[in-house]
Amino acid sequence: MARAKAAFYCTECGNETLKWQGRCPACGAWNTIVEQPDKDSKKKAGLPAPVGVDMRHPRLMAEVEAVDELRFHTGMNELDRVLGGGAVKGSLVLVGGAPGIGKSTLMLQICDNLCRFSSVLYVSGEESERQIKLRAQRLAIREEGLYLYSETNLDDIVAAVQGKKPDILIVDSIQTIYNGDSNSSPGSVAQVKECTMALMHVAKGLGVTVFVVGHINKEGSLAGPKVLEHMVDCVLHFEGEEHNSYRILRAAKNRFGATNEIGVFEMGDQGLIEVPNPSEAMLSGRPENMPGSCVTCVMEGVRPVLAEVQALLSPSAYGNSRRTSNGFDYNRAMMMLAVLEKRGGLALSNCDFYVNVIGGLTLNEPAADLALITALASSFRDKPVPFDLAAIGEVGLTGELRSVSAVNQRISEVRRLGFTKCLVPARSTGKIIAPAGLTLIRVSNIREAIAVLI
């Protein structure tokens, strides 16, 4: 006997149940369980089938013709890098970020570049067409080939795409679009899921490249159901600090390229400006002969980026010491503090602890461990690290230094930025080739590193 299908769902989290309940068992919200519309009664005629796909019969893999995905350049090298060499025709790209970070500005500047050789339909559910044009004029966006449409109804948007047949569709934002066949309100889990599914059919069925803007919630993750990120082809996070002009576009998912790639932009009066050399930008204005600062090199995808790690240790004036970390994983920073105290012989238990990564970068890889250890020891002893020195290496719980990946790429970037000395683990996997003018200082543990530098 076939199992009964779920007839109710939660409008907050999308959880499906067999019967009505006052409280959702998944998210705990009250009075959010509603009856699910009959799926068989929904009209699917407005959603085209994917191009070149036979939806009627299964096919042998040997019979499927393999064709390389057609890419095109967006006109922004940093965005092309994050997308894996350009946008793919018929792909669905989700761009998320905090309010005011510059998502709409990025989308308009993409329009300016793409309108030169293709037609673009810009759909906004948050601004009127007049407001979009005023903002476009401020950014000096070209008007030829760019269609503006202020609409939130999904059926009207799909009809406009089928009528205008644009090459690129931009939807700002997915939380404002609604499907009239659904009983839930715009922005709800069910609406976001259904609208994204419809846009996916538009992208695959008509071969239109779709960029969708998404909001983030208070936890910093994309608002809406988690399935939203599984449905799209690419997930891009647009990050930045409120009082910092630099913006970082990071790929969290990419079906057509590598993940963890980043693109760096600077927000100015004329919109977003690409930063082709992020290492130099992150180190601009670095003070000389100041304790508590050390430079390291991290890999963002295949791109080496130099980052300045700053640390401050000061005697605690109260009973409990304060511990804060900005841009460096808090748990890993606490681990480095404990290793330095235990294996490095420094009494840090009565000190307030502050860590900051300059430029808005977030360091998640272990290669920055040695730079943090060096900056902490420098701050504790109030002696500066040599200005022309960088530190690369992972630190274990016993205080030993371990090798990291892509060492030669990292030290080449270090030398390119004018550094003459680099602290590296004594034992590294593979042969390390030092560039001309760069001296490698090999150490086995943190005690040796502190003794050599400070």
Segment roles from a protein language model:
Residues 2-12, 16-81, 88-94, 101-119, ...:
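Peripheral, non-AAA+ core regions of ATP-driven protein-machinery
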Residues 98, 125:
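P-loop (Walker A) phosphate-binding loop of NTP-binding proteins
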Residues 120-124:
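Conserved RecA-like ASCE P-loop NTPase motor core of nucleic-acid helicases/translocases
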Residues 129:
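Divalent metal-dependent catalytic cores for phosphoryl transfer on phosphate-bearing substrates
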